[in-house]
């Protein structure tokens, strides 16, 4: 028997958005739109008849806002939710609230040129729905079917930075930690960073997230943590007690000047279909930090970071992968484990200890 299609409920007050998203998703062989609603009140009437595998949800709607609806869903029947948000500061902040409330993915939409943008972003939407369908949301049963990845060709970290020549630079007194994550990473990073004391190694983090969202995300983590957390700026020095988060839409690399590590924030093509890319970050850490670094790959769909973690291991870094039981999506860690890139496989609640102790 063929695998069951992923059923999707769309909730958005824009008729244009609903029309385009229904067409895109229903044109995808493994996805079926079981309903579309103009607001959460209509959505609840549809949920009374049939429950989907995934909900695609706008956050700014009449009668009931998306956050209130999301919290209601998560309290009654936890379900993977993809947030469809505007590319505005308010949209970013509201979407981060949604991620904290249990949403697993964000896709963005502009304020103008909406129809063409959504059509151009069809692959991103489909990938987000597939990632959500394969996520483990709280006590949601895990799907047995593997996610269907986009077979289109993708660039590797070679497009940004050549691999290390075989000899990592000599160890310094400063140890650094590089972290890569995607789907489910916002909640996972919050759990890890808020568990750290003020005195800890400097960190560089790639979280797959749209442009304009990472600054708000960093501000939120900073307000919750004892350490300092902020969006990275070009040439920032990596310091103990500081976590630098790669800006959405940019790659972040580590470089070294004397005994000190800095970051470079650069433009460049998508790597593994992402910008920022975990592989780009990890490769730079392997090249410039080697034995003086720890690499940690956490929850997320796909394979971004798997090869980079192996390069870090080969350069002498300590390497860690999050275990399947604590992942929202066991994709990136799974691919790293397949490559024998992880020295240790540990649950989320132990990752802060891996940061503190090599």
From Swiss-Prot:
GO cellular component: cytoplasm
Subcellular localization(s) per the UniProt record: Cytoplasm
Function: Involved in chemotaxis. Part of a chemotaxis signal transduction system that modulates chemotaxis in response to various stimuli. Catalyzes the demethylation of specific methylglutamate residues introduced into the chemoreceptors (methyl-accepting chemotaxis proteins or MCP) by CheR. Also mediates the irreversible deamidation of specific glutamine residues to glutamic acid.
Family label: Belongs to the CheB family.
Protein name: Protein-glutamate methylesterase/protein-glutamine glutaminase 1
Record remark on domains: Contains a C-terminal catalytic domain, and an N-terminal region which modulates catalytic activity.
Modification comment: Phosphorylated by CheA. Phosphorylation of the N-terminal regulatory domain activates the methylesterase activity.
GO biological process: chemotaxis
Protein EC: 3.1.1.61, 3.5.1.44
Organism domain of life: Bacteria
Catalytic residue positions: 182, 208, 304
Location of the CheB-type methylesterase domain: 170-358
Gene that this sequence comes from: cheB1
Top-level taxonomy: Bacteria, Pseudomonadati, Pseudomonadota, Gammaproteobacteria, Pseudomonadales
Keyword annotations from UniProtKB, A to Z: Chemotaxis, Cytoplasm, Hydrolase, Phosphoprotein
